[in-house]
């Protein structure tokens, strides 16, 4: 009888430890978000990311430093997925999942798709794994966006909106 009670006590403690450790990702300071759109040309584009907030910081200085590689989000790597072979930034890209990284500067951002989509941050990033790299201009957005947000139009225009910054590129 003591063995049965001990077993159930250990099981209950283990279960509560596991559920206590399981993190509700929606309650993170930079919560997860996703956007999926099927374009007019039948390409399904999905972006899975976490949304860092500006919180009064200056983009390019206190957050997403100019000239430095950035994971383009927070927490896990940002993932861009396409269901068909496409052209992005004038370059061909095969259907699949890619890690989305950027190098922001004041006037433009370098957009990078890495063949490795399972990285955390930029620590294990290697340029040899790039599937694509191109530069696109940044602009002042029409409205301030506190939490970084991706928007995809039916024409395949991908827009990163964050603070007063807007970075666009097209998936065709």
Task: Specify the residue positions occupied by each region the protein language model found.
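Bacterial Sec-dependent N-terminal signal peptides
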Residues: 1-25
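Short acidic-hydrophobic surface loop/beta-edge motif
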Residues: 9, 33-40, 80, 84-88
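Residues at beta-strand starts and edge strands
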Residues: 9, 41-43, 96, 107, ...
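Alpha-helix termini
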Residues: 13-15, 55, 103, 109
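Primarily secretory-pathway and cell-envelope proteins
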Residues: 23-68, 119-172
């Amino acid at each position: 009888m003591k063995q049965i009670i001990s077993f159930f006590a250990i099981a209950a403690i283990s279960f509560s430890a596991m559920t206590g450790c399981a993190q509700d990702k929606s309650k993170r300071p930079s919560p997860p978000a996703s956007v999926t759109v099927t374009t007019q040309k039948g390409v399904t584009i999905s972006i899975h990311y976490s949304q860092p907030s500006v919180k009064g910081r200056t983009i390019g200085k206190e957050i997403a430093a100019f000239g430095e590689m950035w994971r383009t989000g927070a927490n896990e790597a940002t993932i861009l997925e396409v269901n068909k072979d496409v052209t992005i930034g004038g370059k061909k890209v095969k259907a699949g999942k890619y890690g989305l990284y950027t190098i922001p500067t004041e006037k433009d951002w370098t957009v990078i798709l890495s063949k490795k989509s399972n990285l955390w941050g930029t620590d294990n990033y290697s340029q040899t794994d790039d599937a694509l790299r191109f530069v696109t201009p940044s602009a002042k957005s029409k409205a301030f966006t506190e939490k970084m947000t991706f928007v995809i139009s039916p024409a395949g225009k991908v827009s990163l909106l964050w603070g007063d910054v807007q970075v666009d590129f097209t998936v065709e």
